Amino acid sequence: LDGVIIFLVHLSLKYRHRQFQLRHLYELISRAPKPVILAGDFNTFWGESEMFLFMKAAGLRSANTAGLPSYPSKMARMELDFILYGAGIEITSFEVPKVLHSDHLPLLCDFELR
């Protein structure tokens, strides 16, 4: 993992705080000297549509191209959790396994550096 920078996050439930946190993350990511992976619980109650502008500005894409929900784990309906990746990274597999050890389902992703 020497050739990549990984950010793990758990963003605020409050929209305004979350937007401040995303702005700070954008500043960190825009200065990153290596390819970036950003993953965690984003608490985005509108799913990827809430993340759209941040992702475009930061040059990130979601590994979850099907928009599979991860919350709540027993009957997942919302996409609160993301694995985002930038240029120089290729996703080779992605899944959301049905593991009920948390209120969120896990995200599993394999990637390769290009």
Question: Each PLM stretch: what is its role?
Answer:
Residues 1-114:
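Active-site regions of metal-assisted phosphoester/phosphodiester hydrolases
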